[in-house]
Regions:
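Hydrophobic alpha-helical
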Residues: 7-28, 99, 111-112, 116-177
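Short beta-strand segments enriched in small/hydrophobic residues
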Residues: 8, 13, 52-53, 79-86
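Flexible loop/hinge segments that line or gate small-molecule binding clefts
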Residues: 22-61, 72, 79, 172-180, ...
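Structural detector of well-ordered beta-strand residues that form the stable sheet scaffold
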Residues: 34, 81, 111, 141, ...
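Hydrophobic alpha-helical segments within soluble ligand-binding/sensing domains
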Residues: 53-80, 122-123, 171-175, 191-208
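Short beta-strand->loop
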Residues: 55-57, 81-90, 111, 115-117
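Short, solvent-exposed amphipathic alpha-helices that sit
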Residues: 62-66, 90-109, 122, 126, ...
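Hinge/cleft segment of the Venus flytrap/periplasmic-binding protein
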Residues: 83-87, 91, 101-103, 194-230
Length: 230
């Protein structure tokens, strides 16, 4: 992209740290960069003296909305497990933090937090292991809906359907039937399409030499909403 002499890059990085040196080269070459979806690591950006605007939701807030809703269905002291995304990514870390905020506030016991790598199969394996190790588990909080799908299968295979609640994040199409029939209690919609639109709009402004409207943390915050049974 840098060699192609583009004017701007809108990037949703899989890793919050790995691409920062490349983006430093891009900005040094005069290319405007906007970060969407998964926020680049703030400390790594600072180490490269980079200021890259981020367009995306408050993942921690979104996960807390989901966790708060789940907590209303639980009893203080209940055991829960968290299936995290890729642990090195900012959005995974923030969602886990939001889940823990809600569980701590409601006095639930988080007995395990393990990475499911955002994947159905890995989420299933992690959920199965948790259900086996913690027979009193009452809920599984998955950092995305793909892992929630895997968790639902694990709950069914363990013979605990209706006894262990599952929540997710993203509101993908595949999760909607499960919300409807109760296999998944709740998820969060972060309107990914809006992130892309806002990201492109911000990039175009920067190319024109205009300022983008960010908060004091350099963020253009996009909506995130709790989604429950229709």
């Amino acid at each position: 992209m840098i060699a192609s002499n583009v004017n701007a890059l809108v990037i949703a990085p899989a890793d919050s740290k790995a691409l920062v040196p490349v983006l430093k080269k891009a900005t040094d070459a005069g290319i405007k960069v906007v970060n969407i979806d998964n926020q680049l690591d703030v400390d790594v950006l600072k180490s490269k003296n980079l200021q890259i605007p981020f367009v995306g939701p408050d993942n921690r807030k979104g996960a807390k909305l989901v966790g708060d809703y789940l907590a209303k269905k639980l009893t203080a002291g209940d055991e829960v497990g968290i299936i995290e995304g890729v642990s090195t990514t900012n959005n995974a870390q923030q969602r886990t933090a939001g889940f823990k905020d809600a569980m701590d506030e409601a006095k639930m016991k988080v007995v395990s937090t393990q990475s499911g790598n955002w994947e159905i199969d890995k989420g299933n394996a992690v959920a199965s292991a948790m259900l086996n190790e913690y027979p009193n588990l009452k809920a599984l909080l998955a950092g995305n809906d793909s892992m929630a799908l895997g968790a639902v299968s694990a709950v069914r295979a363990a013979g605990k359907a209706g006894k262990v609640m599952v929540v997710g994040y993203d509101n993908i199409n595949a999760i909607k039937p499960m919300l409807k029939d109760g296999r998944v209690l709740a998820t969060a919609d972060q309107y990914a399409a809006k992130q892309a639109v806002f990201g492109i709009e911000a990039a175009l402004k920067l190319v024109k030499g205009e300022k983008v409207d960010t908060n004091d943390k350099g963020v253009i915050e996009t909506p995130v909403q709790l989604v429950t049974q229709p």
